[in-house]
Amino acid sequence: MFTISTDPQQLDLDAVHHYLAEESYWARGIPRATLERAVANSLVFGLYAPDGRQAGFARVVTDKATFAWLCDVFVLAEFRGQVLSKQLMTAVWSHPDLQGLRRHLLATLDAHGLYRQFGFTDLAAPERYLEARRPNPYGVPTAN
């Protein structure tokens, strides 16, 4: 049985860092120290295989009062096809610290269908949103 924990001490940061730095389209090249700082200052969700190995991850940046940004969501390739991304999102979406918030945001290139199942929609007023983007923060171009 796969399990999910919000305990950052349980994370296999080597596995999480490898995926984000080497395989993700959004955080390629992220330094380990940057990931460690992000984990320390976020609500994290580790997805674990029955043998305890890291199978997936999600991170939420939030003030726990009005806003949450969902990011760094992934299930490792060897564990895909088992509805685990939905299990991970169910844990995120039902977490007590994320209830009653005015707004949840995320960015995705390829998982719109998954997130729409949890109430995410296109921005209602995209003209209201701006970003200050650093296109190559880790020395390696990223896709978002």
What residue spans do the PLM features occupy?
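Short, flexible, glycine-rich and Lys/Arg-enriched loop motifs at helix boundaries
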Residues: M1-P8, D12, T90, S94-R103
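Conserved acetyl-CoA pyrophosphate-binding loop and the N-cap/start of the following alpha-helix
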Residues: F79-L88
